[in-house]
């Protein structure tokens, strides 16, 4: 096993173990706040920063420029369309329903100005949290996994690690009330395996960490508010609709990343000799 593979193993184990140990203390300390769980988004980036420091590796390859404006636009349009399509389909099929207008969440549907204000507030709060994850997942792990295992296997591995990193958080915080085991241990990893491709595409094409950070925060806010305003009446069916939408988008973007033209643009997609 070469050094880069060892570092990836240290990263994965460190992220999973640290997160699990912290979350395991929540019931003992009577912590039920979602903000405490959200703070764990800094764990992947912190572990990555520690490994980079120990190896004395440069931060420059992560990409700190702003990149072309078109990828910022994609970062807005793509999650908006995906969630919009999924919500509309779920509403039509009866898998979700609008929250009553008399409730705080339902009132946002008929008060768009209030909705935008709340979304902007939470978006600003979410940006540093999203950076904590993206620095670790995209900035550190993704290019190394692709070099060592190739594009498809590397992204699959990243999606699995990313998904199971969420598992203890979602399990302890009871975020899948109807399916407390299936949700965290099966549905969440599948969700992250599918969403890892659009995030990888944005990072590779934009060549900077800010576009996936922005998209991560923006998508989290859209997903969160859509779930509050249009709660699921059938949790699994509603989830399946979103996964089908994500699978279609991921297939298209993965084919683009696998194309010869894209590999000529992004040489990092080619497997490194060090992976042998």
Task: Specify the residue positions occupied by each region the protein language model found.
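Central hydrophobic cores of alpha-helical transmembrane segments
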Residues: 154-161, 211-221
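Membrane-helix interface segments
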Residues: 4-9, 32-34, 58, 68-71, ...
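Short aromatic-rich membrane-water interface segments that cap or initiate transmembrane helices
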Residues: 104-123, 180-190
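C-terminal membrane module of polytopic membrane proteins
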Residues: 205, 215-276
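Membrane-interface helix/loop boundary segments of multi-pass membrane proteins
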Residues: 17, 132-159, 204-208
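Alpha-helical transmembrane segments
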Residues: 7-21, 43-45, 74-83, 161
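Membrane-helix interface linkers and caps
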Residues: 2, 27, 31, 35-76, ...
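Juxtamembrane/transmembrane-helix boundary motifs at the membrane-water interface
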Residues: 20-39, 94-101, 172-181, 225-239
